[in-house]
Amino acid sequence: MSDSKTIDTRSDLLKLLCEAAELEHGIACSYLYAGFSLKRDLAEGGMTWEQQQTVRRWASQIYFIASQEMLHLALVWNMTTAIGGTPYYLRPNFPQPSRYYPLNVPIELEPFGPKSLRRFILYEHPEKVAPHRKLKSLFALAGEDAEKIEFGSVGELYGLIRSGFSNIPEKDLFIGSRTQQMTSELVHFPDLVKVIDRASAIAAIDKITHQGEGIAHDRDNSHFGAFVAMLKDLVHAKGHGFSPARPAMRNPAARVDTSYGGKAKAIENPIAAEIAGLFDSVYSLMLRMLAWSFEFDSAGVEDQLQRFCAVAIDLMPRVLLPLGEGLMLMPAGPKYPGKTAGPGFGLTRHVMLPPDAKNARTLCHERLQELASLAAILLKEQLPDSVRNGCRHLQVIANTF
């Protein structure tokens, strides 16, 4: 990525917006995985009561940041539909190598720790600001190589997107229907910007970059600042038996599928693999429902859009979060001694939901019922309480949709 490049065609701008959607999506999954790995109970060991409070704070911060990454994805979708595109929610499977994006930093699933926090800091690092001496020293204290830091930035990508919205004539660029834009009245994202012209597109970009990297005089209240503070706290708390994260395996998968790239590791524990497969199926359905809500004109079907968005967003904390946390309490299998499983965020093969709202609802209802039936079968097994809660919540949601 280089801000010396001129973006002056719709095609180039749409390509960049698709890249931004992939990045926001992948980074959100990486954050969630780290959050799932943080211990909850003192019985898990490795922390005192005081340290437990710190770990709980870290988990809350990471989940909040991940929710803002989903807001960023929604903003990118609004920018995309504003100029005639459609929401893009696919991405390469994990792990994504450093060379895949110009970030020069891999995007993968690994538990909370110095290595994952270093990656998160580099994802959110302010554009055009070289890692300063204090940050390099912090990386060194955390046991990471402080000198080999070569990376682009998400902010740089949004700089290119900004140039496209600035360079292409406004009257030619914004061809999308205004009633196709999602707003906070339809989906529970309070900071969602309706993109209808150049000014609102720039406002959406500013919202993303300010939340991620912060602004020059206030980095602390940004994703970048939050992750720097976490790494400082972790480095200073090292020793004395402090172990805040569960020993989850890196880049797990319910089943290994190379069709979308990635070199994930298959979970060998059959029950954990089934739970991970259920997680993937719920996650994929959630994305389909959200993408459908953003893709089609809301005129006359506002109630349907609100219902789709409400159910999709409800699946995140009530089903995906407890399943994800619970998987990290289940052994990964004999091939991974001492390691626990985790969700792979695998994208399952499926067709797009149809434009007709009634037919789309029928497909989603049927799929929810299928997944609820699978959850009922899994509930017969010995499972962590959080997994059981996620399965029961899925049944309730399926029966009320």
Q: PLM features: residue spans?
A:
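Non-heme di-metal
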Residues: 2-401
